[in-house]
Amino acid sequence: MIEWSDSDIIVRDTMRAFIDKEIRPHLDGLESGELSPYPFVRKLFSEFGLDVMGAEAIRAMLDEQRAREASRAEPEDEKTSGTLGKMGAQASMAVALISELAGVSIGLISTFGVSLGLGAATIMTRGTLAQKERWLPELMTLEKIAAWAITEPDAGSDAFGGMKTHVRRDGADYLLNGQKTFITNGPDADVIVVYAKLDDGEADKRGRKVLTFVLDSGMPGLTQGKAFKKMGMMSSPTGELFFDDVRLSPDRLLGETEHHSSGDGRDSARANFVAERVGVAVMSLGIIDECLRLCVDYAKARTLWGKEIGRFQLIQLKLAKMEVARMNVQNMVFQTLERLKAGTLPSLGEASAIKWYSSEAATEVAMDAVQLFGGNGYMTEYRVEQLARDAKSLMIYAG
C-alpha cells in the first residue's frame, strides 16, 4: 500500500465534514472537560453506521460460537481462517477515519478506542460464551462504555511486576483490593476490565499469577474517582479506581478459570499492547497532518517585512521536515496495514518501535508548529498548542 484508496478518501472526506459540523463547534467545551465526550462518540458511531455494524458483527460471532459449542467443534485458528486478512481489507478505511479525527481531538479516539479496542476486545478474546453474551452487545454499540485497568501508582512501565492490586479466594468468590490510576473512562465507565494478582501465598509476589475480571459500576466496594485535570486530552476522562473488598463471583473471572488456555493476564495484556501502540502511530499521523495543514495555511497568510513568511528559507525548512515526518509515519502505518491484509501483525517489539518513532515525530512537529506560529501559536484559538499538548501525551500513552 503506497497511497489511500478512493474508498479511503471518501471516508476521510465524509469524516472531515462530520468533524466540521458536529465536533469543531464544541471543541472548546470538549477540551476544557466541560462537555462529556460520550454523546459525541455515540453520534459518530450512529452517523457512520458503526453501531449497527458492531451489533451485527457481535450477533454473528455469538451465533457462530453457540453453534460451535453445540457441535463441540474446535474453533478455527485465526491465521488459517484468514480472519486477520479480512480485517485488513477494511482497516485502511478505519485508519483514514481515525487519523482525520486525531487532528482535532485524540481524546475522543481514546474514549471509544479504549472501550472497544481494550475493554471489549479483552472480553472477546478471553471470555466464555456466557460472558460475551452478558457484556459485549451493549459495549460494541457504545450503549455502555468500558475501562481497562492495569496501571497503578507504583506500577506503570513495570505494570505486572509492580502490581499491588490483588484478589484472594473467599469460598467460591474472590475479594478484590487495591488501586488503579490513569484509567481512561475510569470516572464514567459502566464496565471495567481489571487486572489483579492472585494472592495465593506465593513468596515471589512479582511472579504471582495475574487474573482478569469484569466489574460493573456501582458494585459495593468499587469507587470511581473524579476525572483528573490533565495537560491534554481533556476530551477523554481519566481517573483512579479504588477497590475495597469488592466481592467477585467466579462468573466475573474471564474464562471462568484460573488456568486460561491463552495464558494468564500478562499474555492477554501483551496482545492488546500491539494494537494499542500501532494505534498511537495512527493518531500521530493525524496530528502531523493537521499541523502541516495549519502551518502551510499560516505561512501563506502571515506576512513579515512585506513577504509571506512561507518565502523564507527557515520556514520552508520547517515545513519540509514536517513533510518528511508525515511520510515516514504514514509509511509505517501503510506497512502495518499491508501486514494485516496478509494475515500477520507486528511483533510487540516492532509495535513498540513504531509507537516510539511516531509519537516522538508528532511531538516534534507540533512543537515546531507552535514555534512557526510564534506568539499566535501560544494562543488557544490557533489550535496548534492543543496539538502540541495532545502529541506529548502519545509519548507517554501506551507505554
Indicate where each model-derived feature is located:
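C-terminal helix-coil-helix/basic helical segment that borders enzyme active sites and/or dimer interfaces
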Residues: R24-S32, V296, K300-K307, E323-Y357, ...
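Internal helix-loop-helix
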Residues: G49-E143, N185-V191, L340, R389-K392
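Glycine-rich phosphate/cofactor-binding loops in nucleotide/flavin-utilizing enzymes
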Residues: L97, L118, A271, F373-G399
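A structural signal for short hydrophobic beta-strand segments in well-ordered beta-sheet cores
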Residues: T165-R168
